[in-house]
Amino acid sequence: MAIKKRPDADRLPISQRIDSRMPNPGRRQMTPTEWAIKGELFLNCSCELFCPCVVSLGAHPPTEGHCHAWMAIAIDEGHFEGEDLSGLNVGLMVEIPGRMGEGGWRVAAYVDERASGKAYNGILQIFSGAAGGTTGLFTMLVSDIVGAEREKVEIVREGKKRGLYIGRKIQGEIEMITGKSEDHPVMITNSKYWMGPDIIAARGLKSKVRDYGRIWDFGGKSAEICPIDWKGPKP
């Protein structure tokens, strides 16, 4: 019986075979730089009960098996490589297929139309994870940035209510859940959650997303409010 001759390519040294493979497709790379943001983040998601991602640090599945959400970030103080970010607003549309910590996030960003060119690009670097620091984990968790655009991003913070308004694309309103003492909302404190240690529990009121082929309604669903103090990597 004739012995079948192996193709020459199969006899190449392993190192040469590896070198000759097709290159990996492009992916976001982290380029750590100097930045900082202080302010407040609030969101409304598709979970029926208070989001289990907070106390489980992303290890527990969302109540619906997936997580759809909008997020609002009010930057009270901030800068990116010397460019002032104070007073700017950012909105995000987020789609997570399973456990938060398992990645696969799809995200759209809406950046305040008042942002300068450098501020706009800096905000995108921060929220894509490329700038490193607190949000650096996004380079691992976010698989697809479906869009980024300048918009009028209106954020309202009045008493126990919060609102995010981006034209007809996102119209979200949430309200803190009142605790035993009416002066203090229900909250989780001293957590290791990535956003911040103190999370105020809230619920969605009027809350609709209509963009990028998504039609979501989070009225009555889980919401949260978190003071943030994020930074770039330590020098």
Task: State the predicted function of each range.
Residues 3, 23-32:
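Non-catalytic, low-structured ubiquitin/UBL-interacting segments
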